[in-house]
Amino acid sequence: DRGVRVRLLLDDIYHSGRDEIYQTLDSHPNIQLRLFNPMGNRGAAKTANYALRKAQFNHRMHNKIFLADGLAAVMGGRNIGDEYFGLDESFNFQDLDVLVTGGGAEEAGEAFDLFWNASRSVPIDSLYPDTNRPDSLSAREELIVAADTLRTVLAKSDADALNTRAWLESTRSSLTWAGTRVIVDNP
């Protein structure tokens, strides 16, 4: 709602039951969502489809790139989930990320575009005929609840951690600057 353009590319392998949420996100005028190498069939038939066409569906995308304005990119092993960002009270994955700027960010953007524009990257809406789309109202309500929960969790966090600019300024001197080269596989 702030005019920011968002493109979200997700691998389809472990996303059963989330199509309503994805379509709801994709319905926002500034958000585009694509699935990489989708299984085709949705619901219970998805698993059977995978078993029958395993060679085709074994080609997955494991890239993680968070790119802002083509100027800075965060890359690493984190998936999208509370447990990857210290927000899950019962489980927390420890992972490493790298922040790249300049030419490295440009290369990260090119890598993202390579996968975004690949024939295996499919807009979520293309998986459903107009008459068979999931109900987006319930998904929208679920997103509102999730956003409210996130606000509550973040409000409990240390105020310094929420002030990103101050945090970046305070950690700038401890960053390690090095040359970069972004390498990805082919889509």
What would you call each of these model-derived segments?
Residues 1-64, 68-187:
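Charged, low-complexity intrinsically disordered terminal segments
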